[in-house]
């Protein structure tokens, strides 16, 4: 699996791995790259079956497989220890990595994540699946911003959204791969295992997230033994895109604090 690695800003700089959500594209993290690369070696990638890592996914594709293939790619690149920043599905992969490779994951940042899928989130995906079956890739892509961004943010950026739609259609991961990745997301359940995650965790959520209620982050916070929760008042599900200034400040402070906390505990 292909990874994109930034040059380390100094010798032995900590590594931060960015894991996007269901869309799978590493470019989702573009608003974070410049600030992160000043202090960390940053790893981005397109998830298997998407972008520049094309593949046909098995019907039983799982979050555990997503975590294993990423860890193996990191080890092959010479990376043994890394912090994880995961958004939604990416946060699930991050938790799986922390469970399966505890000696490697130094810190976990969960952005609009959850322990197991919430009934409201499941309803949203059911609607989106019906759109995919009835209207194909175009209907899926055109509906996606409604679940990602606040209404006023979208209304002020119509040309940008039209360009994003065209790009998403051109690089659509395919119906079968999308549904298999979505099914992996829906099957994931960390409610009985989260208390085994021992690395420090920062939980970031947005109070106006239409797709994932903030209660999901509260449940995560209660279940994770060494966690802190930060709530952004605005930004929607893709709060790192819509309000990068606020998000980046939380992320940078969280990474620095938790990495220091972990080193002090060793």
Curated annotation (Swiss-Prot):
HAMAP family: RutD
Superkingdom, natural source: Bacteria
Pfam families to which the protein is assigned, alphabetical: Abhydrolase_1
Catalysed conversion reaction: carbamate + 2 H(+) = NH4(+) + CO2
Entry keywords, A to Z: Hydrolase
Protein name as annotated: Putative carbamate hydrolase RutD
Family according to the record: Belongs to the AB hydrolase superfamily. Hydrolase RutD family.
Role description: Involved in pyrimidine catabolism. May facilitate the hydrolysis of carbamate, a reaction that can also occur spontaneously.
The species this protein was found in: Escherichia coli O8 (strain IAI1)
InterPro entries linked to this entry: AB_hydrolase_1, AB_hydrolase_fold, AB_hydrolase_sf, Pyrimidine_utilisation_RutD
EC identifiers of the protein: 3.5.1.-
GO biological process: nitrogen utilization; uracil catabolic process
One GO term describing the cellular component: membrane
Disulphides: none
One MF annotation (Gene Ontology) recorded for this entry: hydrolase activity, acting on carbon-nitrogen (but not peptide) bonds, in linear amides
